[in-house]
């Protein structure tokens, strides 16, 4: 990163001008091949990407030589029906150009984020990227709030909106024209972006570029919260600043306050409530407030109008659900979360008079939703729709130990992700399904019965499904009648993406 930063300072690229000459540099394609910039700060799913064996220095040199030709892009456009300028299967060189372009547009924003973290003296921010770090924030804040809103971030209705979003940050016109050309080659210029089909297609073709565009789009949608935070006249905690850095995409837009202040001068009084908290993961976000239901409805009304009028985004009102925290459980990041009232009776006696007081304490609860999780296991062929374990087909050349290790790894990953559950009974049922499915798979392989196979295997199968959390809890907490191990919650700081089986959306 330091070498890259020095190169940009020497050639004047720090001012976001003339990014397109970087397409002629070999190290850009090396970064694209290795998913550079330290694993890409932007990406939430980059660990799942695979390397392409065709990315060699010889291919890159040939690609740069072709791009030096003045009529290369013109010929590619005129012959797009035969070659397919952007299609990965039809033109490998064009796919490499789009991947290199994705790295280039990330560079200024990555440097801006690193400098922002250095100014705030945030030495270690990787722990804050963990998904589990959101739930302690919920636990600390939501117990004092009244209402919660489930919000789905709207999708842009036209491709040009994505290009216009980057114009505020990148003044390099050729780079923006190249981005526009890539987008219109994927879809027709008159087509609309559909939430599922087009995004899944684009993410498979060039996931890095898609994530960059999507994050920049979401950041624009969330910019209203930065503005409203600055408009609040109440004191704010210092921890909120670091939380804002990892929630939003990159930094802050300096002129945003002036622009929005001129556009919405009469509605600022609606947002003076300091007890408003916002959390997002991917396209779903949670907005919680201590205000009245009237205030929350005003939030909904102005968010919808702000997105539609200022960013030309179509947001249906039913994409924002308003509920009271005491009567509603919201689904977020694979957990079913709610605020429960736990009543307790306190008896006190003063001289001859005795008093009894009933108190209710709000407590944040997180549980594992058993029905959606069983549906995910049924889709993965571990059980049927009713949760009955079945044998999973595996390759015949796999040994028994390899099959047991695979089942055990799946069970440990699920237990690791759902370690913050308040009630572990649902998780114990999932472990039972995976363990019995493993036994059925092995008994089917050996053409034996499950009972006979479990009797022969003994405790070896059980030890493979014993998670590290259970071993640690048995050492930290002694087994006493008052101790309830199924109520212990553990949040980890190494989880940067949602578990596939836990993602039911």
Swiss-Prot record:
Keywords: Chloroplast, mRNA processing, Plastid, RNA-binding, tRNA processing. GO terms for biological process: mRNA processing; RNA splicing; tRNA processing. Transmembrane segments: none annotated. GO terms for cellular component: chloroplast. The lineage of its organism: Eukaryota, Viridiplantae, Streptophyta, Embryophyta, Tracheophyta. The gene is matK. InterPro entries: Domain_X, Maturase_MatK, Maturase_MatK_N. Belongs to the intron maturase 2 family. MatK subfamily. Usually encoded in the trnK tRNA gene intron. Probably assists in splicing its own and other chloroplast group II introns. It holds the Pfam family Intron_maturas2. One of its GO terms (molecular function) is RNA binding. Coiled coil: none annotated. This is Maturase K. It is found in: Plastid, Chloroplast.
């Amino acid at each position: 990163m330091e070498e890259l930063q020095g190169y940009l300072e020497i050639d004047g690229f720090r001012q976001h001008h003339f990014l397109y000459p970087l397409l002629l540099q070999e190290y850009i394609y090396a970064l694209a091949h290795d998913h550079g910039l330290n694993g890409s700060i932007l990406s939430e799913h980059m660990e799942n990407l695979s390397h392409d064996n065709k990315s060699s220095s010889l291919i890159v040199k040939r690609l740069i030589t072709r791009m030096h030709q003045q009529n290369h892009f013109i010929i590619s456009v005129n012959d797009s029906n035969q070659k397919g300028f952007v299609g990965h299967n039809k033109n490998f060189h064009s796919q490499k150009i789009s991947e290199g372009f994705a790295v280039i547009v990330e560079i200024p924003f990555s440097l801006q984020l690193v400098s922002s973290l250095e100014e705030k003296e945030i030495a270690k921010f990787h722990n804050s990227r963990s998904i589990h770090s959101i739930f302690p924030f919920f636990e600390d804040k939501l117990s004092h709030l009244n209402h919660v809103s489930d919000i789905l971030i709207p999708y842009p209705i036209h491709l040009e909106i994505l290009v216009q979003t980057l114009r505020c940050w990148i003044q390099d016109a050729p780079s923006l024209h190249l981005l526009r050309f890539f987008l219109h080659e994927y879809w027709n210029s008159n087509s609309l972006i559909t939430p599922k089909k087009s995004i899944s297609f684009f993410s498979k073709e060039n996931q890095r570029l898609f994530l960059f565009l999507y994050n920049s789009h979401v950041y624009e949608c969330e910019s209203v919260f930065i503005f409203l935070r600055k408009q609040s006249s109440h004191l704010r905690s210092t921890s909120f600043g670091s939380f804002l850095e990892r929630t939003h995409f990159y930094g802050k837009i300096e002129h945003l306050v002036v622009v929005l202040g001129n556009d919405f001068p009469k509605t600022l009084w609606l947002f003076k409530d300091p007890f408003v908290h916002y959390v997002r993961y991917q396209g779903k976000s949670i907005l919680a407030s201590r205000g009245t239901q009237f205030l929350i409805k005003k939030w909904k009304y102005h968010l919808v109008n702000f997105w539609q009028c200022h960013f030309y985004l179509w947001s249906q009102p039913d994409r924002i659900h308003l509920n009271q925290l005491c009567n509603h459980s919201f689904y977020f990041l694979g957990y079913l979360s709610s605020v429960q009232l736990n009543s307790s009776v306190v008896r006190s006696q003063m001289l001859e008079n005795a008093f009894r007081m009933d108190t209710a304490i709000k407590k944040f609860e997180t549980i594992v939703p058993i029905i959606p999780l069983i549906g995910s296991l049924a889709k993965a062929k571990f059980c049927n729709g009713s949760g009955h374990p079945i044998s999973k087909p595996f390759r015949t050349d796999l040994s028994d130990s390899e099959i047991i290790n695979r089942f055990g790894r799946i069970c440990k990953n699920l237990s690791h992700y759902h370690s913050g559950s308040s009630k572990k009974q649902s998780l114990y049922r999932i472990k039972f399904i995976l363990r019995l499915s493993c036994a059925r798979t092995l008994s089917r392989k050996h053409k034996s019965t499950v009972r006979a196979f479990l009797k022969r295997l003994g405790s070896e199968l059980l030890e493979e499904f014993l998670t590290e959390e259970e071993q640690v809890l048995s050492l930290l907490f002694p087994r006493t009648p008052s101790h309830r191990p199924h109520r212990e919650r553990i949040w980890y700081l190494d989880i940067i993406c949602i578990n596939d089986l836990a993602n039911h959306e």
